[in-house]
Amino acid sequence: MEKIIECVPNFSTSDPKVLDLLKACFKKHGVLIGYECDIDHNRAVITCAGNPKKVIKAVLQAVGVAVQNIDLNTHTGAHPRMGAVDVIPFIPVKNMTMQEAVEVSKIVGSKISKKFDVPVFL
């Protein structure tokens, strides 16, 4: 039975060029569902869902894009933020438990920390 997980990462940007790069990460893996962008908050929210391995790959690629292209030293916006990527919630959709979604979040957090040398709060 195929497992499906949803993820809704929040990025601290409203730059159309960066948003296109971020969306491309999810399109490449066939998991992009939609996105919202708010200029006043300088924030983009992407919704993706699919096979957990594909979602993980897309999220990690998008975090790399965010780390390279979002500079919080010059960031403005009404929304409070902690990083280029603020939150990466995982939601079990089909044939997955909440505990499995939590495990996915721990795997992703560990990979982000190691690959990009940034702090991760779980």
List the predicted regions and their residue ranges:
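Long, contiguous binding/interaction regions
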Residues: 1-122
